[in-house]
Amino acid sequence: MPRSSGAGSLANLDLADRNTLASLQRGEDRTALGLAGVAAGQQSWDVFDQAKAEGGTEWRCLAEALYFEARGESLAGQVAVAEVILNRVDAAVFPDTVCGVVHQGAASGKLHGCQFSYNCDGRPEHISETGAFDQVGRVARVMLDGWARTLTDGATYYHTTAVRPRWARKFHETAAIGPHVFYRRPDTIARN
């Protein structure tokens, strides 16, 4: 649960919390994360001023995916990756759970058979940066609790700028945030 946003709460923040709040205070992150929703009273920045986030299996799957896919990115980049995962959960052509989406194709055993590359890179998934995991855990909690998905315009795909996959030419580019480019199918209209 979010802590009080009173004057004393800032003194209790750990370094990861301070970094999160600092990134929210930068204009581009506020705009990217739905300033209109905050202004309308629909969302509050206080949700990112919370103690260590926790949750069930779906939270754990989302937090792990964010850790392995976006832990070094800005808050906006982490939220954008979370949006893609949650947009897939809502889309009929993907599994209807976060864990199903995140692990889709992992059973194939193929190097590039996974929807999220960390599941098929041949390396064990080990969370060694606890501060980074705490950060993405907070993002996962906020997103699962219903933070408006306004960054990627309904994207259900993304890739790093280090690659140029052929499939991307068939889709509509919706955003470029940090090292990722986001897409949706051309016949898909954002519903979130």
Cite the ranges covered by each PLM segment.
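Long, low-complexity intrinsically disordered regions
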Residues: M1-S5
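Bacterial extracytoplasmic/cell-wall-associated proteins, especially those involved in peptidoglycan
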Residues: G6, L21-N192
